[in-house]
Amino acid sequence: MSKIAFLFPGQGSQFIGMGKELYEQVPAAKRLFDEADETLETKLSSLIFEGDAEELTLTYNAQPALLTTSIAVLEKFKESGITPDFTAGHSLGEYSALVAAGALSFKDAVYTVRKRGEFMNEAVPAGEGAMAAILGMDAEALKQVTDKVTEEGNLVQLANLNCPGQIVISGTAKGVELASELAKENGAKRAIPLEVSGPFHSELMKPAAEKLKEVLDACDIKDADVPVISNVSADVMTEKADIKEKLIEQLYSPVRFEESINKLIAEGVTTFIEIGPGKVLSGLVKKVNRRLKTIAVSDPETIELAIQTLKEENDNA
């Protein structure tokens, strides 16, 4: 069988009702949701299954909710005996990838991402930061735009390098507005403001990163059993000291997702399994290289289908 990477989604993929079937049908998944409730001392599971969508979207709720659901999907998928050669995640998804790789316990991870969400929320007063997706412009040209705007006194930088022609910028509200206009003047097809609560993956998140360091200091981070591709370096991380450092840097650094996928391709990965709600990452992978095989698993039905497909492929190999 060709090499497999497990990918884990980030914020934005959440929806009310995600993981509910797993909770009802898979004892290991139910234990995870119960453990999340206990660790966070709140009924996170009730919010996920039947809560208010706006409340679930709040950064400090969305992050533990997505992590819990992704790991619940993983628990069911693991029953198949299919194991990854690599794991990776998009922003918050990196924590799920580290749990999957044995570097972080679920309990430590769910607590940490709850605090991470709170710190990100507190870092910049509401309305002062912004993010926007810039379509149809390469990273080098867009970086010249953001550097120019920043030099003129309005901080803005590249935040998510998702796939060819799709880059998210982040910074002060004014910086993002000016960079969006300048990008369009310089050939970008579109600039789409994003509905987010803060300027994530920008220098403005440094106060949050300092607080996050204290939380990570208290975590029992281990060396990873499976290589994890870091958002910050787009390269392999396995050592616990490196993992901790990268998680802190990740808050104020760009997510180099396109480069991460290219790194996985270079390592021989041809099958990408997106584990958790939605199909956002599968779409991005296809935009990096449409010949790659992507499978998105999020509930008992899609998990069974994926297992069947992979086993048939293996039998035919």
UniProtKB/Swiss-Prot annotation:
Pfam families (alphabetical): Acyl_transf_1
GO biological process: fatty acid biosynthetic process
Keywords of this entry: Acyltransferase, Fatty acid biosynthesis, Fatty acid metabolism, Lipid biosynthesis, Lipid metabolism, Transferase
Catalytic activity annotation: holo-[ACP] + malonyl-CoA = malonyl-[ACP] + CoA
SUPFAM superfamilies tied to this protein: FabD/lysophospholipase-like, Probable ACP-binding domain of malonyl-CoA ACP transacylase
Protein's UniProt keywords contain DNA repair: no
Keyword Lipid biosynthesis recorded: yes
The protein's name: Malonyl CoA-acyl carrier protein transacylase
Species, as recorded: Bacillus subtilis (strain 168)
Gene: fabD
